[in-house]
Amino acid sequence: METINTIELTDENTFPDKSVLKKVLGRSYNAYVGLLKLYDNNDLAYEWRYYRDGKAWLCKVQKKKRTIVWMSAWKGYMQATIYFPERYIDDIFKLSITDDTKDIIQKTKNVGKSKPCIFEIRNKKALGDLEKVMKFKILTK
């Protein structure tokens, strides 16, 4: 039987600092650090905040005031999600990303009129496709 993972960082009073994230992410913590470097290299700002509607801490990643990526912590990995209007989906599939990533994006259900591109960051290998999709998001209007 399949076990469904649940989002971590649900305690409003516990800020997701380095020690908290190391505990939640475990071996994937180094990939998270690589992810932060990727954001820094692309002049993106990131900030953890508790969202009452979702009852969890989320990290919003922005270029100037535009949200590019949303991150959430799960047991053993960081999830990074980039939302696109439907009109960009065909262009995403033209990017040089792996077929596995394209398959995941294609199978993910839309949220309203947006398509979430979800990446499970368990190791640094996952950062390549994320970076390509993220840079495409930065270029779109």
Annotated model-derived regions:
Residues 1-141:
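Charge-dense, helix-prone N-terminal extensions
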